[in-house]
Regions:
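Nucleotide-activated chemistry modules centered on ATP-dependent adenylation/adenylyltransferase
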Residues: 1-224
């Protein structure tokens, strides 16, 4: 049994990675979430900070919030790993990446700097099969972001099911959304009662820059 910290997005892939680690007898010492200091939302997935805290409480796993403005993202991440190693006795940081080599290299480099292992439970497995494993394991997740150049806004708010995955594939998008076509928020699961996402939501949108390309993402604003 080894203690680990989970680099957590509140989405399906990181949740499945967390689930696999727990099933193997490992102990999650904390959830590590990077937060945009200026917006009080998680980087990349845009989950409000107050909701992240509710997820941590629901999972009964301590939370490590890494506040960064972006230019210090790398150093802050490594610093958080070092602190977790020293204070919590973790052996590794777990990531939900599947096959994006650049992500793996970055994560591995940060873990090497911190003197811990980088663990990728889903690495190079079939994307579509991973989605079905997630669904068949009893987890429930809602689509909270879509890239409009790939998918229509009618997918927003849909619970990810086998039928919805089929619809996603028919748009030409990756079944797992690994290319950024969509992001999810997990609200229920087999090993824990997650926070109910539907308590007071409203639509919102913002324009963000990804790799210097302007994209419009529609999302759910989730509040309590």
């Amino acid at each position: 049994m080894k203690k680990f910290v989970m680099s957590y997005s509140c989405g399906k892939d990181s949740t499945l990675a967390l689930y696999r680690m727990i099933k193997k007898g490992n102990t999650p010492a904390a959830l590590l979430v990077t937060v945009n200091k200026e917006e009080n939302r998680s980087w990349f997935h845009g989950i409000p900070e107050n909701l992240i805290k509710e997820v941590s409480k629901s999972l009964n796993i301590p939370l490590i919030l890494v506040e960064t403005k972006g230019n210090d993202y790398e150093s802050k991440f490594t610093e958080a790993l070092i602190k977790a190693k020293d204070s919590l006795g973790i052996h590794s940081c777990v990531f939900g990446d599947i096959d994006l080599e650049a992500h793996r290299e970055w994560c591995t480099a940060r873990c090497n700097e911190a003197g811990i292992e980088a663990n990728f439970p889903l690495w190079q497995e079939n994307r579509e099969e991973l989605v079905y494993e997630f669904i068949d394991s009893g987890f429930k997740t809602v689509i909270k972001n879509v890239k409009l150049e790939c998918m229509g806004e009618d997918f927003l708010g849909k619970v990810l099911t086998r039928e919805v995955v089929k619809d996603i594939k028919e748009t030409g998008s990756d079944a797992c959304g690994e290319n950024g076509e969509y992001h999810t928020f997990v609200y229920d699961g087999t090993f824990v009662e997650f926070v109910a996402y539907f308590l007071g939501y409203k639509f919102w949108y913002k324009i963000i820059t990804i790799n210097f390309k302007l994209c419009i993402h529609y999302s759910f604003e989730i509040s309590f």
